[in-house]
Amino acid sequence: MQGHQPAAYTLRKHETEVTCLKVVSWEPYPVLASGDAKGELYLWNLVTRRPFAGYKLETKAQIIYIKWLNNYLIVLSKDHTLRFLQLHNETAVAIRGWAGNQFELQSFKIVYEVPVNTLNFANVVVTHMRESQYRLWCCNTMDSESIDVYEFDVKEQRSLRRLVSGINLYKAIIKAGNWSTGESLDKTGIVMCFLEHNGVVYLGYECGFVLGLQLVERSGENPTIVVSYVSSVHYPEPVLSLCYNEREEVILSSSTNDAIGVHALQAHSVNVSESEIAFFSIEEGIAIKRDLTLINKSIHLPTSKIGHLGCVDGRLIAVDWSGRTLVCEKDETKFCFSKQRSNVLVDESSAGTFDQGKAPRCHIKATSMACIGKQTLRELRGIRRGEKRRTELCANRSWCFTGYEDGSVIMQSFET
């Protein structure tokens, strides 16, 4: 069947750099959450390409991280605060948010706040534990090279409890059996990024290492951080981004060079039971596999300085520091686009290759990215025929959303 012609649209609402984008599950079709350098947040209807909800932080602090979980918009900002936001009127949004007509933006209210160290630009990991209780992985309050783990109840303002404090994983790295003692590494550097998948939390460090961690709680004892995976694939360059490739079942990482680290899940999805803990060396609350070795596997892309990674149906989407967005299949570029100072979207694709040496230098800087694959829609009820047709057209395409320093978001389709 012949593929669709690529489509591109511009989402305009932000007046400053778009620093964070996140696709959010919604009915009948996912929506996009966006945040900027001055603390403004929006939820976008991707069929009408209009915002239907918004919020402005009083501190005007830059948005670093966005997640939608259990009807909470979870937001980390540079004022050292993680906030749980909730729509004032979820029913109104559900009924009216999908209509094509203009209406006043729905607003959010703050339901919970947690202080978080944001001296660097690392994100956090937030997971749901039970009922209204959540777990937070983040940089240590005073030291961005170490991590803390908290639990809290969003319905109890004074429920914050620290499970793990100031864990530094430098010793775990140098204990890897095949780490060359001739290599120079006196510290990990700061934590650059976090990612959680299937109970394992992945950390990307300034020194180029990627670690897979689990938190084990045993009755009557303090929690233990289990180091189940270590890779030095990017050493000594910093890890810039982490993402999950569902089709290949791997975690991918990027850095300042052209290498994409490939971290296979089977190598580190360890279920640590009471009996298995004997195979670990435990010191200062950190458990390390006695046979821990570095696992370094990578592929290479025709660009470098990859600040943002995403995966859709096996395709790898990469955004580099110069402003280019590449859609790749393994190491081959299938589609490439950028936004120039002339405000024109430029298709740089050329027979599946990308010549970095001839790239123009007038791109607008890309500052955030999110992506979504083709969607299977449930039966569409209660919406007009025209809206139904437009929703189906959106669902039959894969999309990349790239945020730029001029406040715009490009919504670009591509084939998968």
From Swiss-Prot:
Subunit (UniProt): Component of the ASTRA chromatin remodeling machinery complex.
Record function comment: Component of the ASTRA complex involved in chromatin remodeling.
Record-level GO BP terms: chromatin organization
This protein's UniProt keywords: Chromatin regulator, Nucleus, Repeat, WD repeat
Organism for this UniProt entry: Lachancea thermotolerans (strain ATCC 56472 / CBS 6340 / NRRL Y-8284) (Yeast)
Cellular component, GO annotation: nucleus
Listed Gene3D superfamilies: YVTN repeat-like/Quinoprotein amine dehydrogenase
Descriptive protein name: ASTRA-associated protein 1
Family: Belongs to the WD repeat ASA1 family.
Domain of life: Eukaryota
